Amino acid sequence: MKILYTGANGLLGQKISAATPEYSNHAFLATARGLNRTKNLGTAAYASMDITDRLQIKSVLSKFRPDVIIHGAAMTHVDECELHKELAYQLNVIGTQNMVDAAREIDAHVVHISTDFI
């Protein structure tokens, strides 16, 4: 199975990366905006991907063709979301919609993970 996960530089993404060696029969692609800042990618490959950029998402997904997408990328700090409402909307709403739309095009299953604060 091929598994792509977003938010690789965040807490959840780092935990997934660390766990990938336990699932060596699966291929993993870790994604986040910009450079990889995760110290331990485990067995995952890394691709820079901005979830607000539909074309970039399509490009990454068409190359990797994941069966499952674990979507954990988000703006998670409540105070920052309040201060930067438009950015929070772009990342947490539009970015999520972009991921779902792109997943639908390649028939990938989406697991969306969030918090009760967002």
What are these language model-derived features?
Residues 24, 64, 105-106:
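Helix C-cap/helix->beta junction micro-motif
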Residues 6, 31, 69-73, 110-115:
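SDR active-site strand-loop-helix element
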Residues 83-111:
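NAD(P)-cofactor binding segment of oxidoreductase domains
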Residues 1-23:
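N-terminal Rossmann NAD(P)H-binding glycine-rich loop of SDR-like oxidoreductase domains
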Residues 51-91:
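NAD(P)H-binding glycine-rich loop region in Rossmannoid oxidoreductase-like domains
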Residues 41-54:
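Rossmann-fold cofactor-recognition segment
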Residues 24-38:
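Conserved glycine-rich Rossmann-like NAD(P)H-binding loop of the short-chain dehydrogenase/reductase
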Residues 2, 27-28, 109:
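Residues at the starts of beta-strands that form the adenosine-phosphate
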